[in-house]
UniProtKB/Swiss-Prot annotation:
Mg(2+) binds at residues 250, 259. It comes from the Bacteria. Belongs to the SELO family. Transmembrane segments: none annotated. Pfam families: SelO (PF02696). Keywords: ATP-binding, Magnesium, Manganese, Metal-binding, Nucleotide-binding, Nucleotidyltransferase, Transferase. GO terms for molecular function: AMPylase activity; ATP binding; magnesium ion binding. This is Protein nucleotidyltransferase YdiU.
């Protein structure tokens, strides 16, 4: 593995947005989990990554010759308030490599130590939050949702002081890039239009090369990002995923999910579901995610206005027209996805829409577990109504809905291909992380195995398909910084 090479394209093309930096030395690095499948796809030798030299690479203490680790600069709106200088406070971009499919991928560290962007933070991360991101990001990938990936989590042997002293860790993350709406906001706030233009060109080359030859490639970039984000948010909604911190610095240009700090999956269906301990007003609630995405994209458009047209009024009109397509793309993706969840892919949309509206009201009024419902409904498509009927208190209302739905000829087998049995249920995640913090990785490994094969029911994993017991109570998440 001595021939591993990492490019420094971002640092080379956008030096104004990259600060060369080194990871802090990990005093006693110990590999906790390694993603063999991802390593293989990246052309990396998993056995070598498990070696002492490989583990040192995974925490950034040994980098290939020619690699240029950098902390990336970005700005962002955080809960609606603008911060002009955020950046990688506890992260480093080690560099880029080309995977087995010919795609350029970032190799990135999280929790690698204090950088010039750290502000008052220590730049470190604890084992629990890094394992959480590994678990949830790999579950999202298995669900078919665009996401950053997790290559490894390594315990550093360094204590991390939070409310108590915790074991430190580094997550090795892989992404199509770490370009964010906040990256463009940082470039724009400098007042350097050429920097914004070069950043846009970099984004086009990496993510949307098809627009490079368009009459207006920068407008094409914006339209492509709007479309990618519409598809992404729809996929979140279809599985009950609540991101929890949809700041503009956490919206990617690639259309991948990033930053799994306070995220969680909705249990009982409720559009007002919020898990994050710092989201006291519910800004990033489950049902608000589409509108927040549109708001973030409007902030992205603002950074690109000088590239759209020299005439500001015309530039604004172009941006508004392009942003207007986000809602149409989102509704189209959500409708198609819901039809698939109901086994009604071949049925005309107008016949399904009122049925779906009625169903969502029934789910909310009856406090029904979102994931369990759709999986049980697949059994009803095959004639076994009792599992899904057993979820409801208002049986008369649900039975009437069930008759209308079955009259449309749902496909139960198709439903099972899109409705998961296993998701990272909150009580199971906490159970696994608590055990891992005590040195027992077995619950984490079992849960990881379940959620990375989410659609196939397997013997011995029944408890991983069940909602949280009532005693688990109301769930709150924390960002882990």
């Amino acid at each position: 593995m001595t021939n591993l090479s990492l490019d420094g394209r971002f640092a080379r093309e956008l030096p104004e947005m990259a600060v060369r930096w080194k990871a802090e030395e990990a005093p006693d690095p110990r590999l906790l989990v390694l993603n063999d499948e991802l390593a293989s796809g990246l052309g990396l030798d998993a056995d070598w990554l498990r070696s002492p030299d490989g583990v040192r690479l995974l925490v950034g203490n040994s980098v290939p010759d020619g690699a240029t680790p950098v902390a990336q600069a970005y700005a962002g709106h955080q809960f609606g308030g603008f911060a002009p200088r955020l950046g990688d406070g506890r992260a480093l971009l080690l560099g880029e490599l080309v995977d087995g499919d010919g795609r350029m991928r970032d190799v990135h560290l999280k929790g690698s130590g204090h950088t010039p962007f750290a502000r008052a933070g220590d730049g470190l991360a604890a084992v629990g939050p890094m394992l959480r991101e590994y678990l949830v990001s790999e579950a999202m990938h298995a669900l078919g949702i665009p996401t950053t990936r997790s290559l490894a989590v390594v315990a550093t042997g360094r204590p991390v002081r939070r409310e108590s002293v915790l074991d430190g860790a580094v997550l090795t993350r892989v992404a199509s890039s770490h370009l964010r709406v906040g990256s463009f906001q940082y470039a724009a706030v400098t007042g350097d239009t050429d920097l914004v233009r070069r950043l846009a060109g970099h984004a086009i080359a990496r993510h949307h090369p098809e627009v490079a030859g368009a009459a207006d490639p920068y407008l094409g970039l914006f339209e492509a990002v709007c479309s990618a984000q519409a598809q992404l948010i729809a996929r979140w909604m279809l599985v009950g995923f609540v991101h929890g911190v949809m700041n503009t610095d956490n919206m990617t240009i690639s259309g991948e999910t990033i930053d799994y700090g306070p995220c969680a999956f909705m249990d009982v269906y409720d559009p007002e579901t919020v898990f994050s301990s710092i989201d006291s007003w519910g800004r990033y609630a489950y049902g608000n995610q589409p509108s927040i995405a549109a708001w973030n994209l409007a902030r992205f458009a603002e950074t690109l206005l000088p590239l759209f047209d020299d005439d500001i009024d015309r530039a604004i009109t172009l941006a508004q027209n392009a942003l207007g397509a986000f809602g149409r793309h989102y509704e189209g993706a959500l409708t198609a996805g819901m039809q698939a969840k109901l086994g009604l892919t071949g049925v005309d949309g107008p016949a399904v829409a009122p049925l779906l509206d009625e169903l969502l009201k029934l789910l909310q009024d009856n406090h029904i577990d979102f994931t369990s419902f759709f999986r049980a409904l697949g059994l009803a498509a095959r004639g076994d109504n009792e599992p899904v009927r057993g979820l409801f208190v208002d049986l008369a209302g649900f039975d009437a809905w069930l008759d209308s739905w079955r009259a449309l000829g749902p496909d139960g087998a198709a439903m099972d291909r899109v409705n998961p049995v296993y998701i990272p249920r909150n009580h199971l995640v906490e159970e696994a992380l608590t055990a891992a913090a005590a040195g027992d990785m077995e619950p984490f490994e079992t849960l990881l195995d379940a959620v990375t094969g989410p659609f196939d029911e397997r013997p011995g994993l029944q408890r991983y398909a069940e909602p949280a017991p009532e005693a688990f109570g109301r769930y709150r998440t924390f960002c882990g910084t």
